[in-house]
């Protein structure tokens, strides 16, 4: 596996902001996902907010959610924690904690993830979790692709956008 659940290589993404920058940071990734979600679902009234404080973590630290998506009428919300790892590191120890912490969140949410630095075991854990979604949009993307479909589907189920799941299928 090379960063995507289907084993395909992760597309190269170079930040617009700085031509000297060649690697995406975790903050770059969260901004990219937030921008994608905001643009993709703005016609449905969805608003995406970055770095929102919500209660405490499972170790009693103040929690800051990477992306908070609020539905059109303000009655439903969905939290997205972003994990991007482009090189081998300590992320393997952090993912089980992140999944446990997400379960303790007082609202529905998921972990959006991408990058080539996850071990095969952690990629399997994320791919198997109903609370994680591979997501790697391109800058300015507004349509669903194989690289965004998992997050699109979690948001669609939460907010009741069944047409996102059905796409162009006809009823029986």
Residue ranges of each PLM-predicted region?
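Hydrophobic anchor at the start of a short beta-strand
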Residues: 44, 48-49, 109-110, 133
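Phosphate/oxyanion-binding active-site loops and adjacent basic polyanion-contact surfaces
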Residues: 29, 60, 90-94
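Active-site metal-binding core of divalent-cation-utilizing nuclease and nuclease-like domains
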Residues: 44-74, 89
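Acidic-basic catalytic patches of nuclease active cores, encompassing PD-(D/E)XK
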Residues: 1-56
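Catalytic cores of nucleic-acid endonucleases
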Residues: 75-78, 83-130
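Well-ordered, non-membrane alpha-helical segments in soluble/globular domains
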Residues: 32, 94-96, 148, 152
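Non-catalytic C-terminal interaction segments of nucleic acid-processing enzymes
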Residues: 1-6, 70-73, 127-172
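Hydrophobic, Leu/Ile/Phe/Ala-enriched alpha-helical segments that form helix-helix packing faces
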Residues: 33-44, 102-105, 126, 158-162, ...
